[in-house]
């Protein structure tokens, strides 16, 4: 678990795609979903740590063919979102007006 423990402790948790980070020494539960990832105080720190740990590992063959970014902090530049479309599933927002206002 990464994202739930991080959220209840006021941290940033990032769960990378399987193969980006080695699963060596991770207690196996699901070979298609197991992954390790950073829990940090800031988004920048999570991206920096992911850059450091995202490496191929001979002991974890899934990591050998994964495509990785050379520097995950480069995606934090606001210009990196130019041209990106972000969708909001309106039905999942609920009926509370304060929650709806946050999505607008």
Model-found features: residue ranges?
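A short helix-breaking turn/cap at a secondary-structure junction
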Residues: 12-102
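FAD-binding core of FAD-dependent oxidoreductases
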Residues: 1-10
């Amino acid at each position: 678990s990464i994202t739930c423990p991080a959220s209840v402790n006021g941290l940033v948790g990032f769960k990378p795609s399987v193969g980006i980070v080695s699963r060596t020494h991770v207690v196996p539960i699901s070979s298609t979903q197991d992954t390790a990832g950073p829990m940090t105080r800031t988004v920048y720190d999570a991206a920096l740590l992911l850059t450091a740990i995202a490496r191929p590992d001979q002991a974890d063959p899934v990591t050998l063919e994964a495509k990785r970014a050379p520097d995950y902090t480069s995606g934090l530049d606001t210009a990196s979102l130019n041209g990106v479309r972000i969708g909001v599933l309106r039905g999942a927002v609920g009926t509370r007006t304060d929650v709806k206002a946050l999505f607008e």
